[in-house]
Amino acid sequence: MAMAEGERTECAETPRDEPPADGTLKRAEELKTQANDYFKAKDYENAIKFYSQAIELNPGNAIYYGNRSLAYLRTECYGYALGDATRAIELDKKYIKGYYRRAASNMALGKFRAALRDYETVVKVKPNDKDAKMKYQECSKIVKQKAFERAIAGDEHRRSVVDSLDIESMTIEDEYSGPKLEDGKVTITFMKDLMQWYKDQKKLHRKCAYQILVQVKEVLCKLSTLVETTLKETEKITVCGDTHGQFYDLLNIFELNGLPSETNPYIFNGDFVDRGSFSVEVILTLFGFKLLYPDHFHLLRGNHETDNMNQIYGFEGEVKAKYTAQMYELFSEVFEWLPLAQCINGKVLIMHGGLFSEDGVTLDDIRKIERNRQPPDSGPMCDLLWSDPQPQNGRSVSKRGVSCQFGPDVTKAFLEENQLDYIIRSHEVKAEGYEVAHGGRCVTVFSAPNYCDQMGNKASYIHLQGSDLRPQFHQFTAVPHPNVKPMAYANTLLQLGMM
């Protein structure tokens, strides 16, 4: 998605060699110029549209593919970005930005070795380019770190961070005046104090943070992979989508819709962290409410509650900056126990991403998923976190490069087989904060307004009433936040403007 303000801006490139000026090629250049203007205005969808039209007229121009690849990167369509970058290189092996684009796409997909190969190519061609060297060195560090982690994982049985913690011996210093758990328990007073403390940009004491993490892990690991909830006719529940570290917008949700309680239950549908630079504040607030109301405050896993995403998009860096690497490891353990889906009254299924790459998946199949792991590259767990709907029937290759895209016929068949009415998912920015697709059978909700301080989108949350379960949408807009830019803790390669 769009980068934070203040980062090095990478603009769509203008072709160096003007093609022959016949009518078709001239029109392609005009379309490319229009696309560049949309790109500069951060209207990436229209930029993609006009680059695509230029490509139709002149499919042999590598720069058109390179430019569209960058626009796809901005809209998180990493699979499409990878394809365009590869095509640009095929057309012109000397087109260096094609290698940059492909490396960025592979980085976004967690394919660090493939990214390193492309950075290595750039360094060989431009050995004196400091920027290229820096990107190569940073990517090389990640590859070595991943290799080290794999070696450790293969040499010993997995040991929980909890086993190495001695929370009781942690001392809360006299000068700390912030919120503390009461007799080791989260209370409503603690939660109100915590939100105000965070609003004032202060840090929760590490002992309290560890207490919350250890306790919420105990709660989550007892849950089913598919949480099943019954609403009485007079009861309602609020469903929120991605919040992505936008803490002040989370506070606004509670201001507009009321604090969580036993009579005001919530479901937060994944992607609590990354991108926004208040992810620690968001996730500890959500975990606190989960401890306070374990049966009325629900958290589902998103594709950003995973190590690969956290390493790139900021959460790992943020936890290390505000606390320690050990605490990040504990967050990672806790994320692995987050449920993957929730079913309301046996009729509405909620998951972060969407439906499946293969037919015939049942609710019982979801229940049987062993979720306590990093997600695989394919299969039902991957699909629940990563897939997206598409308007045409059938399935197609994912624009993200992970999982699939599924059409209205796929949704209809899944719902009929499992006796469901519709699904609610998140995972995608929507200009109005929500979208109803597939004939009302596939609803998207997104709760991070003006995503990354750049997209200008509204956000929304959904009310479901037990009496009819029809989604009632409530839109809201972004509120001011302190001058800490999104992606402030993201991987150095992101901060260098490569994504």
Curated annotation (Swiss-Prot):
Residues 1-24 are annotated as: Disordered. Substrate binds at residues 244, 275, 303-304, 400, 427. Mn(2+) 1 binds at residues 242, 244, 271. Keywords: Acetylation, Cell membrane, Cytoplasm, Hydrolase, Magnesium, Manganese, Membrane, Metal-binding, Nucleus, Protein phosphatase, Repeat, TPR repeat. It catalyses: O-phospho-L-seryl-[protein] + H2O = L-seryl-[protein] + phosphate; O-phospho-L-threonyl-[protein] + H2O = L-threonyl-[protein] + phosphate. One of its GO terms (cellular component) is nucleus. Binds 2 Mg(2+) or Mn(2+) cations per subunit. Mn(2+) 2 binds at residues 271, 303, 352, 427. Disruption phenotype: Animals are fertile with a growth rate equivalent to that of wild-type. Males weigh less, exhibit reduced fasting glycaemia and improved glucose tolerance, but retain normal insulin sensitivity. The modification N-acetylalanine is found at residue 2. Residues 495-499 are annotated as: Required for autoinhibition. The keyword Translocase does not apply. SUPFAM superfamilies: Metallo-dependent phosphatases, TPR-like. TPR repeats lie at residues 28-61, 62-95, 96-129. Its EC number is 3.1.3.16. This is Serine/threonine-protein phosphatase 5. It comes from Mus musculus.
